């Protein structure tokens, strides 16, 4: 197993241009596919999850051209649904942002489509989405365990009508349903059951759908109305914002050991909810400065917070490791959906924080972290989860440094993360 030793860092300073957002990249690729016309996507994220989406689209007959560095994609839209005369089997790795939307999109056309992935993908639920698609006439068959991939779609199109979908586990199910609703055979009324988690990710979806010419009537996130007869039309060019979750590590670095760290590609005009991570750092005592497309973090003594972070679940992980440098006990609440991500992030985070000496209480949907008087060095297991590796890079700011096991798992969203992280030191 590969290991990366991060020696103690005294101070950080510098500027980082954040790579494209995973959430926006895969949504935009699918909408561009369904749209009429040619779309040029710039600042596309070059990572495993996006490669799985691109490979699947190519297999389904979508034509696109990538720049040499894979960050510009010119894609020829199908001007409608995806169909295939021959049976197709698509491997989607552990990419939830490809599995869920493609599962929904492939019900719209004609053909037989089987979706598979890595072993962890077979533990990541998709039942709430499939239940909703079945209400609209979709034929979806589970191949192993009910409610989980792999699965086969026997597509004949999607009917309109009223549909209920659970909102309390993952916003990706609602996102997938919203994106395909305009291409159903009639108007679609989506009723959300339970409290909707990660609302800002739904805002990303609605903003991108609007960019491609589709109107959704949002009734306070409890009901969504999509009138029949709409179609996606390419806006020509789509700029993919920097990934706000990825920005969180560099902003936390500035808050803990600044110096001054500036991240570009996200700012006050961002459509991503995870930029609100900077507000949490500010509550902890960091000095934060906002621009339209940048955020600056400067360091100071941090103090603990007790907050509901359901709206920023990915970025909230960074608060868990930043808490080791804060005075007092930090509590991160309403984060049950950490448990169904790339790994069970609540259990993994608690285990690894204890390794470095923290006192941790792991609840069903919360975590309490009290930092130790002295942080211990340790070998951090990353569970093939990119965010675990990046979060625990913050331990380089302890006097003892840290060792990260399997650091290359960051390739899921940020292949050169540790190179960028090293550029801030000094």
From Swiss-Prot:
Pathway where it operates: Metabolic intermediate biosynthesis; chorismate biosynthesis; chorismate from D-erythrose 4-phosphate and phosphoenolpyruvate: step 6/7
Entry keyword set: Amino-acid biosynthesis, Aromatic amino acid biosynthesis, Cytoplasm, Transferase
TM annotation in the entry: none
Keyword Hydrolase in record: no
Keyword Isomerase among record annotations: no
EC numbers: 2.5.1.19
Record field: catalytic activity: 3-phosphoshikimate + phosphoenolpyruvate = 5-O-(1-carboxyvinyl)-3-phosphoshikimate + phosphate
Record-listed phosphoenolpyruvate binding positions: 22, 96, 124, 172, 345, 387, 412
Annotated Pfam families: EPSP_synthase
Subcellular location field: Cytoplasm
Record: residues binding 3-phosphoshikimate: 22-23, 27, 170-172, 198, 314, 337, 341
InterPro entries: Enolpyruvate_Tfrase_dom, Enolpyruvate_Tfrase_sf, EPSP_synthase, EPSP_synthase_CS, RNA3'P_cycl/enolpyr_Trfase_a/b
One annotated GO molecular function: 3-phosphoshikimate 1-carboxyvinyltransferase activity
Broadest EC class assigned to this enzyme: transferase
Family membership: Belongs to the EPSP synthase family.
Subunit structure comment from the entry: Monomer.
Role according to the record: Catalyzes the transfer of the enolpyruvyl moiety of phosphoenolpyruvate (PEP) to the 5-hydroxyl of shikimate-3-phosphate (S3P) to produce enolpyruvyl shikimate-3-phosphate and inorganic phosphate.
Protein name as catalogued: 3-phosphoshikimate 1-carboxyvinyltransferase
Name of the coding gene: aroA
């Amino acid at each position: 197993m590969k290991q990366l030793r991060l020696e103690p860092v005294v101070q950080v300073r510098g500027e980082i241009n954040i790579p494209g957002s995973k959430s926006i990249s895969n949504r935009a690729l699918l909408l561009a596919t369904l749209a009429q016309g040619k779309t040029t996507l710039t600042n596309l994220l070059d990572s495993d999850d996006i490669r799985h989406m691109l490979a699947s689209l190519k297999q389904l007959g979508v034509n696109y051209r990538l720049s040499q560095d894979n960050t510009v994609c010119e894609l020829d839209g199908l001007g409608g649904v995806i169909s295939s005369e021959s049976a197709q089997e698509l491997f989607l790795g552990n990419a939830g942002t490809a599995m869920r939307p493609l599962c929904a999109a492939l019900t719209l056309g004609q053909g037989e489509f089987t979706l598979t992935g890595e072993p962890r993908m077979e533990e990541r639920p998709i039942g709430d989405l499939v239940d909703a698609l079945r209400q609209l006439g979709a034929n979806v068959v589970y191949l192993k365990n009910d409610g989980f991939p792999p699965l086969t779609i026997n597509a004949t199109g999607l009917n309109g009508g009223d549909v209920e979908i659970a909102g309390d586990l993952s916003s990706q199910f609602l996102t997938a349903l919203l994106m395909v609703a305009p291409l159903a055979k009639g108007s679609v009324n989506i009723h959300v059951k339970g409290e909707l988690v990660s609302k800002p990710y739904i805002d990303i979806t609605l903003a991108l759908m609007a960019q491609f010419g589709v109107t959704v009537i949002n009734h306070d996130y409890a009901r969504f109305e999509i009138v029949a007869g709409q179609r996606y039309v390419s806006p020509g060019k789509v700029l993919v914002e920097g990934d706000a979750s990825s920005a969180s590590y560099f902003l936390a670095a500035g808050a803990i050991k600044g110096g001054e760290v500036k991240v570009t590609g996200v700012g006050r005009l961002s459509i991503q909810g995870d930029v609100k991570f900077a507000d949490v750092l500010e509550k902890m005592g960091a000095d934060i400065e906002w621009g339209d497309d940048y955020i600056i973090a400067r360091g100071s003594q941090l103090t603990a917070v007790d907050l509901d972070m359901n709206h920023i679940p990915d970025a909230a992980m960074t608060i868990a490791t930043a808490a080791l440098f804060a005075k007092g006990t930090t509590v991160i609440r309403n984060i049950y959906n950490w448990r169904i991500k790339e790994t069970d992030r609540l259990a993994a985070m608690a285990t690894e924080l204890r390794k470095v000496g923290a006192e941790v209480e792991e609840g069903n949907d919360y975590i309490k972290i009290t930092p130790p008087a002295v942080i211990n060095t340790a070998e951090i297991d990353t569970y093939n989860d990119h965010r675990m590796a990046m979060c625990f890079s913050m331990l380089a700011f302890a006097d003892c440094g840290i060792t990260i096991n399997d650091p290359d798992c960051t390739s899921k969203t940020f292949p050169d993360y540790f190179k960028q992280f090293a550029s801030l030191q000094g």
